[in-house]
Amino acid sequence: MNHTMRPFLFIAMACAVAWAASARAQVPQSGPSFHEAVGMAWAIDPVRIELQVGHHSARARVSAAGSWFAGGPTLSGEYMDDHMLGSNEGYTTYQGGVSVPLWLPGQGSATQQVASAEAASLDEQLNVEHMALSIRVLDAAAASLIARTRVDVAHTLYDAMARMAASATHAVHGGELASTDGQMAQAAMENAHNELALAQEEAENAAASLEALLGRPVVPDLARYGEGDVTHARFIAPRDMEDNDPRIKVAHRNVEAAEANMKLARRSFMPNPEIGVDAIHEKQYGSPWDDRVGLNFSIPLPSEVRNTPIMSEARNRLASATSQETQARRMVHLEMMRVRERLIAATTVRQATRTAADSMERRAAAQEHAWRVGEAGLDTVIAARQAAGGTRMASARADVEWHVASIRMLIATGIVP
């Protein structure tokens, strides 16, 4: 039994050395700041490109709405003679004209107001996307840091289990320990090895997700943000924070655009009239060619069949925009409360878990020492080491979540630190 365990122990220790080298190789350098990371993600964000194209299009509509006429010119032409089907007396007429649609009273300025309001809404949508992207980067960075911490904790536990397994194997070989205790130590080491493999997988997945956002294999340094960065945020009134939120701003811009559209619908109470110039060139029987020039106009009359759907659509748009603004204010208000409470809770949890982690680590060290001098059982030591690893992981997670809550508080105030 002792001879079969010795080669297995050597293999396990070799694996531990290999895992240690891998972990050291993966220790990140000092990463970019969170602000720089958001800039990396913003530079390659496809939604940003889409919104910017829409923004340029909206500005083009604003410029086009300043035209003198409500549309492009219309060309018309006619040709008539009596050669084929008529009396064949030599009558020939050429007639052509050009006309343009005119704005109704106030319709041109109302059209410009609608285009300007929609362009302003797209500006705020860019800010909303930037805020949403900042939160996605923050969550991905936190997940990556927590995953790396899990690797460190799992590696520390594996080293401790491997060390205890080596001691147990030596004791079993010397007849100082029962073989069942040696098997228990080997099983604990294998469990720690399995946890390390799972932690490595989680870290790789989290790093891949973050790299997809940033375009680079880097992890932003969140630890530099903390108490000092959110001091001024505590003195900002919740109402001011809500009004400064881009989601409320874009909802308000949409209401303004809907109101401008309602005004435009009222101004468009009839189809646009047209005015133009006509020219006639004709030849009559026994007479020389005759040329004439005149004006033409066309005035379609108002109709409920046309106007009712236009007004109904404008009213529906305004009602929907107003409802969405109210819902956005409620959602942002609740989120602000959650962000504040989360920061308070994260601060408390961070302090508590840090103290617990220190205490459990000292307890595990004391239990291992007691086991080596024969004053404690192996199962007690293994349980103490596992508990110490769990509290250390909880402490590290709480520390990352505290930094995340601090940054999230800054984002809520409109600042990307």
How should each PLM-predicted stretch be described?
Residues 86, 92-93, 183, 194-197, ...:
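Outer-membrane beta-barrel domain signature
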Residues 23-76, 101-103, 110, 141, ...:
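Bacterial Sec-pathway N-terminal export signals of envelope proteins
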